[in-house]
Each structure stands twice: as C-alpha cells, then as structure tokens.
Amino acid sequence: MIFNSLINIINKSSPSSLNNNNNINSKSLQINSENKSKIQNNNPLGNKGGVQF
C-alpha cells in the first residue's frame, strides 16, 4: 500500500516538473537566439569578427 501510494505521488508530480523544465529550456533558447542576432548586428566585422557563436 505504501509503495503504491509513493508511485502514485511520483506519477502525479513528474509531468508538471517535466513541463516546467521544458518551459525553462525553451525560454533560454529564445534568449540565446535574440542575443545572437543583437551581437551580429552590432559587430562591424560581421561573421568574421572575434566573437563567434
């Protein structure tokens, strides 16, 4: 009984935590792409500049 209840708690909690991780990852990817475009626009040497991503 105790083991079954623990499995139920884990099953209930895991989807929400996975969704939270996915949301964080997608947000960080959006921030990274925005920063890339800003750096390339501000870099006078373009893609041949010293800072590459």
Swiss-Prot record:
- Biased amino acid composition, Low complexity: 14-33
| Protein's name in the database | Putative uncharacterized protein DDB_G0281041
- Renumbered residue ranges of the record's region Disordered: 14-53
Tell me the superkingdom of the source: Eukaryota
